[in-house]
Design a protein with these regions (language model features):
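C-terminal, loop-rich substrate-recognition/catalytic regions characterized by aromatic stacking residues
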Residues: 268-335
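Catalytic nucleophile-loop/oxyanion-hole region of alpha/beta-hydrolase
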Residues: 34-37, 63-82, 91-94, 265-270
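Loop/turn elements at helix/coil->beta-strand transitions in domains of secreted/extracellular proteins
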Residues: 50-55, 108-112, 133-137, 223-226, ...
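Catalytic histidine neighborhood in serine/cysteine hydrolases
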Residues: 249-266
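Conserved alpha/beta-hydrolase "acid-adjacent" motif
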Residues: 235-241
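Conserved alpha/beta-hydrolase
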Residues: 48-64
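Accessory cap/linker subdomain of secreted extracellular hydrolases
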Residues: 4-33, 37-45, 49, 77, ...
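Short beta-strand/loop motif that positions the catalytic acidic residue
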Residues: 222, 228-230, 234
Length: 335
């Protein structure tokens, strides 16, 4: 993005409940050093030797992409859809944003998968909600599935773990890194006239603005097979974000599986599981992944790559346990 994480440019939460918060200062822009976004080569190393092609695309308002980041609005769902349409020959592509030579993805089979972590884990789900033909499988890792649940909680303003005072407009500043000549327009029309106007830090209530950034409201469009991945100790994007989508997709009858580990923010499923998931739905190879347990849970003290399989999540064989505090009240007690 074009902004750092200095808290002097976050919201100041030190004010009376129900009062208008102090105005947030906007950060100075960080100068862009390279006009070609740096993409990790990890997926290239993992997937290309197995016969997959890897495509890196930039979300609106980042890299070479036009438009503005909106932090969960429709353009961030339609942008990856456009890439998938191009991969399937339904949209035109060019070597430059304005002109250039036509480019066709003649090498693509038409079967596409998406994987990413955190903000980049939200984008596969966003694309899937459009119901775009050809997006066969996704693996969202620690995805933010509702910006209300990320920044609000039952009418209260909350902040993701470690970022006191962050809000949706702060994330906009962090993500926004596209065409510098468009920056002022995006800041005025998206950051000031939309995000800051409707985020409502006074009441923390759920409104149309937040509803438009809740992917559960668009879940009926999902047709892709979904492998959700999250950590139980993620205090940034809470595991509830994946659980709510997992439960909704089960009710819809969409192929869905989940992987949970004991770490913090991020963490892909073991690669053998990732490979099986994409092999089944992109190569259309019957590797019996559907017959395997639906939930893979890394138990306490176990290695992240050695999850325990369960029929579902929550475990159908689990039962409630009553816990009671003990001790004399003068020191740390036990349960």
């Amino acid at each position: 993005g074009t902004s750092g994480t200095s808290e002097e440019f976050f919201w100041n939460p030190d004010h009376e409940v129900g009062a208008k918060p102090p105005e947030r200062p906007h950060p100075p822009e960080i100068e862009r050093k390279d006009f070609r976004p740096l993409n990790s080569t990890r997926y290239i190393r993992q997937f290309v030797p197995r016969g997959f092609a890897v495509v890196h695309s930039a979300s609106p308002g980042t890299g070479y992409s036009q438009g503005c980041p909106t932090i969960g609005a429709d353009n961030e769902s339609l942008a990856p859809k456009a890439v998938i349409d191009w991969l399937n020959g339904r949209a035109r592509g060019f070597t430059a944003a304005t002109g250039g030579d036509p480019v066709e993805a003649t090498w693509c089979t038409g079967k596409v998968g998406m994987i990413g972590t955190s903000f980049n884990g939200t984008l596969p789900l966003a694309a899937a909600t459009t119901g775009v033909e050809g997006l066969e499988a996704i693996i969202p890792v620690a995805p933010n599935t509702s910006y209300y649940h990320y920044y609000r909680s039952n009418g209260l303003v909350r902040h993701p773990g470690g970022y006191m005072g962050e809000d949706i407009d702060v994330l906009y500043d962090f993500v926004h890194s596209g065409d510098p000549t468009r920056r002022d327009w995006c800041n005025q029309n998206i950051r000031e006239d939309e995000l800051e106007k409707y985020l409502d830090r006074v009441t923390g209530d759920y409104n149309d603005f937040w509803a438009g950034r809740d992917y559960l409201n668009d879940i009926d469009g999902v047709r892709s097979a979904v492998l959700m991945a999250h950590a139980f100790n993620d205090w940034n994007v809470m595991p509830e974000h994946s659980v709510r989508i997992y439960e909704a997709l089960k009710e819809k009858g969409v192929p869905v599986m989940c992987y949970f580990h004991q770490g913090g923010h991020g963490g892909d499923p073991p690669f053998w599981l990732v490979n099986q998931w994409f092999t089944r739905y992109l190569y259309d190879i019957d590797n019996e992944i559907e017959a395997q347990p639906r939930a893979w849970i890394v138990r306490e003290s176990d290695k992240r790559g050695e999850p325990t399989p369960y029929a579902d999540y929550p475990n159908p064989e689990a039962s409630l346990v009553d816990l009671f505090p003990t001790g004399k009240g003068a020191r740390v007690g036990e349960l």
